[in-house]
Amino acid sequence: MHTLFISDLHLSPKHPDITASFIQFMREEAIKADALYVLGDLFDFWIGDDDPTTFAEQIKSEFRQLTQQGVPCYFTKGNRDFLVGKRFAQQTGVQLLPDEAVIDLYGQKAVVLHGDTLCTQDTRYLEFRAKVHQPWLQRLFGLLPFALKQKLVRKIQSDIRDDKQHKSMMIMDVTPSEVIAVMHRYNVDLMIHGHTHRPAIHSIQTDDQTLKTRIVLGDWYSQSSILVYSKLTGYSLLSRPLINIE
């Protein structure tokens, strides 16, 4: 018995090797799991649930096949796919989670999240996040023609790339005090997140001498990153080569 966690695949038609590796994962590994958690940034950018492209349908089909075969799939929105909505959930059978969710892993409580909200030193990003998460703005964006939304997103992505070049690695990493604050808020000793693209398993000793664990999922740019949480043996963070597409 085991549960799987992935994040930060940044799926895009531009990266067929990542897409092929994801499809293989869904069909050969996820299908055998008790549940699958996707902790944000599945897509390089999700423009909206009205995406008519073959690529979008291909990805939705993989989730639909998985959930129809009885494997629960839970989805946390990331900073690249925060526009995933109810229509996507209905079409795929996935269950959308709030920004922070407490789950039960075979008797172990854990808080799962994408991880961007832990980076409290990145104030410019958090200001941007607050703006684009406003419901009225998302509704307005959703009313735009798909082609216009694509154009706007390309501009946003370009601005984000330029902004990243001027940020230090420390600013883009999590703030330790925020990690502890979130774990205390939910009274958990285990946190699982993505976003930073720095896969690792961290042990944290708090002021009250409690030992806590923070597991960070990696991206799929050059290899896969999968957290396997087994009922019998606990957790292991795995990576595998991507499928080579000639």
UniProtKB/Swiss-Prot annotation:
It is found in: Cell inner membrane. GO terms for cellular component: cytoplasm; extrinsic component of plasma membrane. Its cofactor is Mn(2+). Binds 2 Mn(2+) ions per subunit in a binuclear metal center. Mn(2+) 1 binds at D8, H10, D41, H197. Mn(2+) 2 binds at D41, N79, H114, H195. One of its GO terms (molecular function) is UDP-2,3-diacylglucosamine hydrolase activity. Belongs to the LpxH family. This is UDP-2,3-diacylglucosamine hydrolase. It comes from Vibrio cholerae serotype O1 (strain ATCC 39541 / Classical Ogawa 395 / O395). The gene is lpxH.
